[in-house]
Structure formats: C-alpha cells, structure tokens
Amino acid sequence: MSGAESYRHITVLLNEAVDALAVREDGVYVDGTFGRGGHSRLILSRLGDAGRLIVFDKDPQAIAVAEELARSDKRVGVVHGGFASFQTALDGLGIGKVDGALFDLGISSPQIDDGSRGFSFRFDAPLDMRMDTTRGMSAAEWIAVASEQDLHEVIKNYGEERFSRRIARAIVAQRAESPIDTTRKLAQIVAQNVRTRERGQDPATRTFQAVRIFINRELEEVGAVLPQVMCRLKEGGRLAVIAFHSLEDRIVKQFVKKYSQHAPLPRWAAVREADLPELPLKIVGRALKPGEAEIAANPRARSAVLRVAERTAGPIPEQSQRKTSEWQ
C-alpha cells in the first residue's frame, strides 16, 4: 500500500456537493481540490463520454492518485498546483467556459493522519505543513525567521487565538536557544502559554491552524479563485464550495452575497431594485451542513458548510475581471 493510499479519507458532503453541480453528461467541470478523488469519481459517474473533468491539487500524493485516474479515464485532466491559477490552467488546457466548479477547502484527512507531513500535533514530526512539499517555505523555516509581531498577527488573525502575543513571545525566546523544528516542540510551547483550555480541543489547535493557513496562503487563494470561477462559468453553471472554518466560509459567503444581492437602496432613490441590472450570481438554496449520521461516521465533517451559487446572464463588473489578473 502506497503512502498516498495508507490513510483513510471520507469525502464530506459527497452527494450533496455533486448534486449541487447539476452535472450534465456533456459538461466541463472542475474539482479544485482533488484530494483522494471522492467528489471527482462521483462527478465522472454522471458524465458521459463527451464530458470533461479538470482536477487541481497542490499535494504530490494527491496528484499521484489523480494521474493514475487520468491514465484510465481520458476525460480527466490534471493540474499540479493551487486553484488560484484557475484561469491560466484552463487556458493551457484549451478550455474556455465551464459548467461547474467544486472546492472542498482546507486540509484533508490523509494530510492530517500522515504524521510525516507535520500538520498535526498528535505526532512528533518535522514541522513542515506545506500542502505542496516540492516548493515554498516550511513552517519551521518561517518560524525561524518571522518577527514576533508577524508571529502574533498570523496566530491571532488566522487562528483566532487570544493568547497569540504570549505564544509569539515564547516562540522567539525558545528559538534563541534551539530551533523549533518539530510539531512536538511547537505544541509544547503553545501548551505552556495558553492559560485556558477549550473543551474537546488541544491548546495547540488554533496555532497549528494559523500557521498552516499562512504557509499555504489558503485564504488568499480562496479569495483569488472565486472571481475567476465566476468569469468562467457558463450561464446556469454552478459553483459549490465546502468550507470547514469561519474564516474561509466568511470569504465565500461575502463573495456570493456581493454578486447576488444588490445593496439596499436609500428611500429617496428614484429607481426600484427590480429595475436594477441583473447580478452575475444567484444563491442556490441554503447553506448545507452534514447530518447527524454523517457526523457520527466522520466527526471531522462536523464543521463543514456547503454553499452553492449559479451563474446568471448578468454582466460581471469590470473591477472583478481585473482582479483575476493578479493571480495569472
């Protein structure tokens, strides 16, 4: 059994997310977070011979699984890289508009459960945390050079950790004596500086989340890909996003709201909302969360939220089209 296959992964909101795409047999779809291919395989089962599925992932282990799938199914195209390169990657594959795009954000179970990746404080391993281990600075490398203020801001903003300043100060003091290069070392520093304990949560949880999000630019990539998808969706095409914490869900929620709902008009306005131009997105249903049965089978699904939007015939504001070029 390969390293890519040794860690069990249960796809969250599998049917709900793929149902939300309303897959057409001859459609072109994007799975922006392939992982181990749970969503992708269900999409493929609903595509006909003329359909196409493009999958993205940063993780070399996930890409190995995706490439194996692509060898046996010519409808699949594989992109090794972050989904922030959405439009550039599609251009390179000769693809214009798409019928739907799905994103299952955050970290996957295989990444958490593979102790060697350095994502989890449950294992003593090198402090890496990169989703793409072939490029970029590891968590240990960043912690070794970051200023106390930068450490504080990352832990506070991305981990919503109220003891961020104490933790940052302790990290700087400890690294002056010896490198903080393993998950256990970082977890111990955090535990010594978090004064209160949250029920059912390790004191290192928020700090590890914060460093991981920063190292992988997770929130920036979410903010970057959404306008690109909006520009590439055909009329009637669907965007489905599964988020696992409030920071990324807030980005998705605010984006969809901005492009699906007009700002309230002042009472003195001489125009009615019904007379305003159609906006480029419309919200499809309510945000969905896993049911009790799914949470019982997979406790990691507890915090998942699925939001869905559909492309309308409404024009896309020029400023949104310009923003996409920043990541091309």
Swiss-Prot record:
Recorded GO MF terms: rRNA (cytosine-N4-)-methyltransferase activity
Compartments reported by the entry: Cytoplasm
GO cellular component: a single term: cytoplasm
Known catalytic reactions: cytidine(1402) in 16S rRNA + S-adenosyl-L-methionine = N(4)-methylcytidine(1402) in 16S rRNA + S-adenosyl-L-homocysteine + H(+)
Binding locations of S-adenosyl-L-methionine: G37, G38, H39, D57, F83, D104, Q111
EC number: 2.1.1.199
Keyword set includes rRNA processing: yes
Record GO biological process: rRNA base methylation
UniProt keyword list: Cytoplasm, Methyltransferase, rRNA processing, S-adenosyl-L-methionine, Transferase
InterPro entries, per database record: RsmH, SAM-dep_MeTrfase_MraW_recog, SAM-dependent_MTases_sf
Domain of life: Bacteria
Leading EC class: transferase
Pfam families attached to this UniProt entry: Methyltransf_5 (PF01795)
Family, as annotated: Belongs to the methyltransferase superfamily. RsmH family.
Annotated function: Specifically methylates the N4 position of cytidine in position 1402 (C1402) of 16S rRNA.
NCBIfam families: 16S rRNA (cytosine(1402)-N(4))-methyltransferase RsmH
UniProt protein name: Ribosomal RNA small subunit methyltransferase H
Native organism: Neisseria meningitidis serogroup B (strain ATCC BAA-335 / MC58)
Gene label: rsmH
